Amino acid sequence: MNIDDLSATIAELDSAAIQQAQQRQDQLTKPQGALGLLETLSIQLAGITQQCPPSVQKPIIVVAAADHGVAEYGVSAYPSSVTAQMVANFLAGGAAVSVLARHVGAELLIIDAGVQTAIVSEAANFRSEWLGAGTHNLAIEPAMSQAQAQSAFERGIRIAHELADAGHDLIALGEMGIGNTTAAACLTAIYCQQPAAAVTGHGTGVQAEHYQRKIEVVAQAVARVGSNVDGLQPLIEVGGFEIGILAGIIVGAAQRRVPILVDGFITTAAALVAQALAPKAIDYCIAAHCGAEPGHRIALQQLGLRPLLELDLRLGEGSGAALAIPLVQAACRILSEMATFASAHVDTAL
């Protein structure tokens, strides 16, 4: 894979479909713009899919899980063993994203990108893309090798193409990994040129001296790497295996004109990686929500994405993306099913 040529593999949004969707929105029985972000979203979806009206019938939530060496520094309120335990919980159907996926009628795919103890499961909705027993400690050394970073990214692209081939027309992103808000904070600090304190939150609930320690770790990692890095280098230095796979999924989905629902802080950090490698991929992204992590809003602003929801979520897993799936479907149905002024015999504005 030549990452220098990635943007050439992603088409611009379809201008004819966008124009058709805008014209139809303006003819529907409502004041122009009265449905706010739902109108904007429906037009974006038309441009992504080259269809007016667009349709989302087979959404899937993809949760990538991996461990992080930086967890040994006490940056999380939970031990690394929780990553594998939560993967088991996902597969058993007991996690928040499991419940929400059932609620919104979405399929759920769990990926082991690099859990400390490799997951063994025969579950139909599980796949192993194991890249190692977690990353190295990003505070003191590169989190992964160049080969691991490239493999993670390429695997993500391949997964997205397989999902598109299976008929999935919306890919929602989720993640699990103790220590991964620290990796996300480091990536956000580098890509957005922000100080550690501005992008580092409480994650799983670290408080007081542990929170200050987390800020120090992020600052230490960013200082080690420096700001003059591009391409895959930030992922190599301070990323995570799950973040690399998710970044690849974003690019692969964009190549196939499949819209992507970005979830919380970690998946948004993956979008920053994707943006650095293939800027046009972000045109295919929808921000499900803005969560409680301070770096999340900064990253969304860098990406130019406006969140659909603000619920103070800080769970990850794809929970916010799951909640946004019905909004995406609603945007499609409004454009498809609402009457026009002419068809409903309603007078237009004076």
UniProtKB/Swiss-Prot annotation:
GO terms for biological process: cobalamin biosynthetic process. GO terms for molecular function: nicotinate-nucleotide-dimethylbenzimidazole phosphoribosyltransferase activity. Pathway: Nucleoside biosynthesis; alpha-ribazole biosynthesis; alpha-ribazole from 5,6-dimethylbenzimidazole: step 1/2. Its EC number is 2.4.2.21. It catalyses: 5,6-dimethylbenzimidazole + nicotinate beta-D-ribonucleotide = alpha-ribazole 5'-phosphate + nicotinate + H(+). Keywords: Cobalamin biosynthesis, Glycosyltransferase, Transferase. Pfam families: DBI_PRT. CDD domains: DMB-PRT_CobT. Gene3D superfamilies: 1.10.1610.10, 3.40.50.10210. It is an enzyme of class 2 (transferase). The keyword Signal does not apply. The active site is at residue 317. It comes from the Bacteria. Catalyzes the synthesis of alpha-ribazole-5'-phosphate from nicotinate mononucleotide (NAMN) and 5,6-dimethylbenzimidazole (DMB). Belongs to the CobT family. PANTHER family: NICOTINATE-NUCLEOTIDE--DIMETHYLBENZIMIDAZOLE PHOSPHORIBOSYLTRANSFERASE. HAMAP family: CobT. This is Nicotinate-nucleotide--dimethylbenzimidazole phosphoribosyltransferase. It comes from Herpetosiphon aurantiacus (strain ATCC 23779 / DSM 785 / 114-95).
